[in-house]
């Protein structure tokens, strides 16, 4: 078994190098989607390097798990061997070129989204920058901003629909090649969802519909009544986050003027929580692995990418000075803390924590920092921010159910038409959303799923946010009673990495 342990260590080191190379190329591509050099370098890695690595990894996995001494390995290797066996079960050589084509299509969708800007109020803005106008107390400004964004999105709707059609077809072939009836079944194995089933997800949807949807609709009903809107329009509230104009006519929350101010105040915030978190955040800043501003040509969204060889987290986001941006940065910092807490673990397989628990690290950090938001606001605005964030949890869970339910249908019916897709999407929106008047923009509602990048780039990665939100709320409840215990529980859990199962 000592020989096998040595091979596992060597393979881990090789994986670290390869993972970091791919990470750096992906980061460069998303930071500047207009760079042909960045895009071609990333795709060259995907098309020419990663396929060879996949075959090598499969060959090595088979030799390891079939070795007569594998049963004598120490318990620390149990979960790694389980993952190897799972990878062997679903690996098919004929899926490698399909995976390459999938990445090429996803990259094209990111390039399309990164190039989107709109002319509004005499200036050119990125779509993240336009979000500030959707918080305006002037309904006509909100309407104009929303329509400007929608009209721009509709210019690329056809190509994005084509890309998604191709992705669904590719993914169904991948599943069939691997011996699965649907891509849903395949992904439950590929994502190592050993601890819950499709049926559990559907039951979770039902629970969200029963508990959260009525609360969300009540909040929106109050919005319509208080603001005397007559009816709720899509520019009156963000259905994913609950963000909209203030019910009492107060100016929108603006926690920072620029990224430097946000970073400086977050350093103080984390130091106020604990020296440990403060020092970890300062380390992130010192390492200069942050790209936080929004700009033309930058991919949408936010992420944390851990550089496995350097053991350094990289944070990417599109900050435009909004409360939502502050929450995003805290969210990604939570991921980075998780990565740093795991960095003491020797093997890459030990550091690769379950996705569901990865999101506990980030979502609980959002909740646990709330008491410190006075660093960015006076007392009244800090309360507004906290209330808005907690209401956002109520809005987010139905949105998670929406996206997850949509994906379950998509991949159970891979030969669906676009008309069927629009019809099912709208019925799911009706089930988990609020009554909303779309007027002549119902054509955009049909394809509004395109705004959720996960559907293109990371299929089935979404219900994890809901599972993690429950874990985050539990940790927040602990914090309300005992701040130090919550921080200790947080750090102890994060240090485990992938050495324990999700329930453990």
Where are these regions (language model features)?
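A well-structured
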Residues: 1-252, 265
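C-terminal, non-catalytic "cap/extension" segments appended to globular domains
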Residues: 29, 83-85, 293, 329, ...
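Glycine- and acidic
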Residues: 90-91, 146-156, 194-202, 244-255, ...
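Active-site-adjacent "gating/activation" loops or surface patches in catalytic cores
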Residues: 125-142, 244-330, 335-339
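Short, glycine/acidic-rich hinge or "gate" loops at secondary-structure transitions
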Residues: 177-186, 220-238, 279-285, 345-351, ...
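A glycine-rich phosphate-binding loop feature that marks nucleotide/adenosyl-phosphate handling sites
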Residues: 223-247, 283-293, 354, 386-390, ...
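Catalytic Zn2+-binding segment of zinc metalloproteases
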Residues: 334-348, 368
């Amino acid at each position: 078994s000592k020989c096998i342990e040595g091979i596992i260590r060597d393979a881990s080191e090789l994986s670290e190098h390869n993972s970091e190379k791919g990470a750096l190329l992906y980061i460069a591509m998303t930071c500047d989607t207009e760079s042909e050099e960045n895009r071609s370098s990333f795709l060259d890695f995907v098309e020419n390097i990663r396929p060879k690595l996949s075959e090598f990894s499969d060959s090595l996995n088979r030799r390891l798990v079939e070795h007569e001494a594998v049963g004598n390995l120490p318990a620390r290797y149990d979960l790694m061997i389980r993952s190897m066996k799972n990878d062997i079960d679903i690996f098919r050589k004929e899926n490698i070129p399909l995976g390459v084509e999938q990445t090429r299509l996803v990259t094209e969708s990111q390039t399309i989204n990164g190039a989107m800007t709109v002319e509004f109020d005499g200036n050119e803005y990125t779509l993240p920058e336009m979000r500030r106008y959707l918080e305006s107390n002037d309904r006509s400004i909100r309407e104009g901003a929303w329509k400007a964004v929608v009209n721009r999105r509709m210019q690329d709707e056809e190509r994005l629909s084509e890309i998604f059609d191709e992705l669904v077809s590719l993914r169904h072939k991948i599943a069939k090649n691997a011996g699965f009836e649907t891509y849903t079944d395949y992904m439950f194995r590929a994502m190592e969802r050993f601890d819950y089933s499709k049926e559990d997800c559907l039951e979770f949807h039902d629970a969200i519909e029963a508990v959260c949807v009525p609360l969300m609709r009540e909040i929106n009903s109050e919005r319509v009544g208080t603001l005397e809107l007559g009816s709720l329009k899509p520019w009156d509230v963000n259905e994913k986050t609950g963000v909209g104009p203030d019910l009492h006519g107060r100016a929108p929350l603006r926690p920072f003027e620029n990224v430097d101010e946000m970073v400086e105040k977050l350093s103080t915030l984390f130091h106020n929580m604990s020296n440990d978190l403060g020092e970890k955040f300062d380390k992130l800043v010192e390492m200069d692995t942050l790209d936080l501003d929004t700009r033309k040509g930058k991919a949408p969204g936010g992420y944390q990418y851990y550089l496995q060889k350097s053991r350094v987290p990289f944070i990417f986001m599109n900050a435009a000075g909004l409360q939502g941006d502050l929450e995003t940065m805290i969210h990604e910092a939570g991921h980075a803390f998780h990565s740093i807490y795991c960095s003491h673990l020797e093997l890459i397989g030990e550091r690769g924590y379950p996705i569901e628990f990865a999101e506990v690290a980030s979502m609980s950090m959002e909740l646990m920092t709330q008491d410190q938001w006075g660093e960015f606001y006076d007392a009244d605005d800090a309360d507004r921010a906290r209330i808005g964030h907690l209401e956002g949890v109520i809005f987010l869970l139905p949105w998670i159910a929406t996206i997850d339910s949509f994906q379950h249908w998509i991949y159970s019916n891979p030969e669906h038409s676009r008309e069927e897709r629009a019809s099912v999407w709208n019925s799911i929106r009706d089930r988990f959303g609020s009554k909303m008047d779309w007027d002549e923009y119902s054509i955009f509602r049909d394809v509004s799923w395109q705004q959720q990048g996960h559907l293109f780039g990371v299929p089935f990665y979404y219900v994890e946010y809901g599972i993690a939100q429950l874990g985050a709320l539990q940790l927040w409840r602990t914090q309300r009673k005992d701040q130090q215990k919550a921080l200790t529980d947080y750090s102890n859990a994060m240090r485990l990495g992938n050495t324990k199962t999700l329930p453990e």
